[in-house]
């Protein structure tokens, strides 16, 4: 008897990873993606795993939370991280990718797998059978309504924003200089330096600039994810807030003058050719005309050409602690699994990681095996333990971080040493866990 295919709904990072893991386990899978027939407010291409915000997966070093999760996923055979490594662009200590090549390659890789059936169609309701929901924070209205009926719970939400992207040739290289903070790695960022007068004038105009209006129901519940605040929100919080955030000058000096600027706007390479540059930390909800006016006040960007201006969108997520198990199964229907931002994990790497486990467990269910939960001493295990056991009343999206890992059982004052111990324990426990899998 032919095996029934597992259905994965959503072709983002989580869904792409889930579908790949299912197929690699020898189980047929149908991957549904509604683009290009229908686009969400944040998507622009029909490629799988489109990166709608930054092109960075975070720090590469494995003694950083994101970097540790990268390394765990490499050990687990993640296709998303493998392709990110393959299409990496210079970004100092971060893993950033050429988003066009990255998305195209993943699309071709999935479409060419003999056990993957790729359907460009919208799914209006949760199907029967084994299903992985990976529809992200911008789930289509019909499916969102069906999920609401299934859970009997209201969605939670926050607002997320994307940064502008600039044509490299339009940046004044007589002003902007190449460097990485603390000279880590190769000089990978373009840095636009500001003196105090320029910074204060820029902040003043940023605070006065017109924003895109939120709808009434959005304004009443407006809540931002703290790690992705609009730059204008930071500017309004205080004179020096931006200088302790995205425009902090520490670790940077202009080699031409030997001086440390008062503030620095960093641009990160978007593509391998170096033709496109992303304004790091400049997520924004300003009107498009205002973005051009204010951002062209930045030294070196006076004639900047924008290929994409910043946008903001509302992200919804379910109350995972009430609904989910650490295996990423729904408590009330174990054959329904979910991953990605829909369940409240935050960030690209966390989405791919959740997709890995959801896909792996969906395949195990189809093969008559018990679903897996990762050791809580690993970054992925700790993250999924958190989202399935946090306080439902106060649940908010969570990125990978060392604060969710179990205590080491010893006091280590040095942060680098402490994080190194977390890393060593995590990778050792993951290796042992993998060795004992059946």
UniProtKB/Swiss-Prot annotation:
Work out whether the entry's keyword set contains Glycoprotein. Answer: no
List residues binding FAD: 10-15
Q: Which UniProt keywords apply?
A: Cytoplasm, FAD, Flavoprotein, Methyltransferase, NAD, NADP, Transferase, tRNA processing
Q: Identify the InterPro entries for this entry.
A: FAD/NAD-bd_sf (IPR036188), MnmG-rel (IPR002218), MnmG-rel_CS (IPR020595), MnmG_N (IPR040131), TrmFO (IPR004417)
The molecular function terms in GO held by this entry are: flavin adenine dinucleotide binding; tRNA (uracil(54)-C5)-methyltransferase activity, 5,10-methylenetetrahydrofolate-dependent
Q: What is the protein name stated in its UniProt record? A: Methylenetetrahydrofolate--tRNA-(uracil-5-)-methyltransferase TrmFO
- Spell out the NCBIfam families in the cross-references: gid_trmFO, PRK05335.1
* Localization of this protein: Cytoplasm
A single GO cellular-component term on record: cytosol
Q: Taxonomy-wise, where does this protein's organism fall, top ranks first? A: Bacteria, Bacillati, Cyanobacteriota, Cyanophyceae, Nostocales
Q: Which HAMAP family match?
A: TrmFO
Superkingdom of origin: Bacteria
């Amino acid at each position: 008897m032919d095996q029934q295919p597992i259905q994965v709904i959503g072709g983002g990072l989580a869904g792409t990873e889930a579908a790949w893991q299912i197929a690699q386990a020898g189980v047929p899978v149908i991957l549904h993606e509604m683009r290009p027939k229908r686009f969400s407010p944040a998507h622009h291409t029909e490629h799988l795993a489109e990166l709608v915000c930054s092109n960075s997966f975070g720090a590469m070093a494995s003694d950083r939370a994101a970097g540790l999760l990268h390394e765990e996923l490499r050990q687990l055979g993640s296709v998303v991280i493998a392709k990110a490594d393959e299409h990496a662009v210079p970004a100092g200590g971060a893993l950033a990718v050429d988003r066009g090549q990255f998305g195209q390659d993943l699309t071709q890789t999935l479409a060419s797998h003999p056990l993957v059936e790729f359907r460009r169609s919208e799914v209006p309701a949760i199907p029967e059978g084994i299903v992985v929901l990976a529809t992200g924070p911008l789930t289509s209205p019909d499916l969102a309504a069906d999920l609401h009926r299934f859970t009997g719970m209201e969605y939670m939400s926050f607002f997320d924003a994307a940064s502008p992207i600039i044509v490299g040739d339009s940046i004044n290289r007589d002003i902007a200089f190449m460097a990485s903070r603390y000279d880590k790695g190769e000089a990978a960022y373009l840095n636009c330096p500001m003196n105090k007068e320029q910074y204060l004038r820029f902040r003043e105009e940023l605070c006065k600039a017109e924003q895109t209006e939120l709808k009434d129901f959005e304004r009443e519940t407006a809540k931002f994810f703290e790690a992705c605040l609009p730059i204008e929100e930071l500017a309004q919080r205080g004179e020096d807030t931006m200088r302790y955030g995205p425009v902090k000058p520490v670790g940077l000096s202009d080699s031409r003058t030997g001086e440390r600027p008062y503030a620095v706007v960093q641009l990160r390479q978007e593509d391998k050719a170096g033709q496109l540059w992303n304004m790091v930390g400049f997520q924004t909800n300003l009107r498009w005309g205002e973005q051009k006016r204010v951002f062209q006040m930045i030294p070196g960007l006076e004639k900047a050409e924008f290929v994409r201006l910043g946008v903001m969108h509302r992200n919804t997520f379910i109350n995972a602690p009430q609904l989910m198990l650490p295996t990423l199964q729904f408590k009330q229907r174990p054959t329904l699994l979910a991953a990605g931002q829909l369940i409240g994990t935050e960030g690209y790497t966390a989405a791919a990681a959740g997709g890995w486990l959801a896909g792996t467990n969906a395949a195990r269910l189809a093969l008559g095996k018990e679903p897996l939960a990762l050791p809580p001493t690993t970054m992925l295990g700790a993250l999924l333990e958190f989202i399935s056991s946090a306080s439902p009343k106060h649940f908010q999206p969570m990125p990978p971080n060392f604060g969710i890992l179990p205590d080491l059982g010893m006091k280590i004052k040095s942060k680098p040493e402490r994080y190194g111990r977390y890393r060593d324990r995590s990778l050792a426990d993951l290796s042992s866990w993998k060795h004992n899998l059946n």
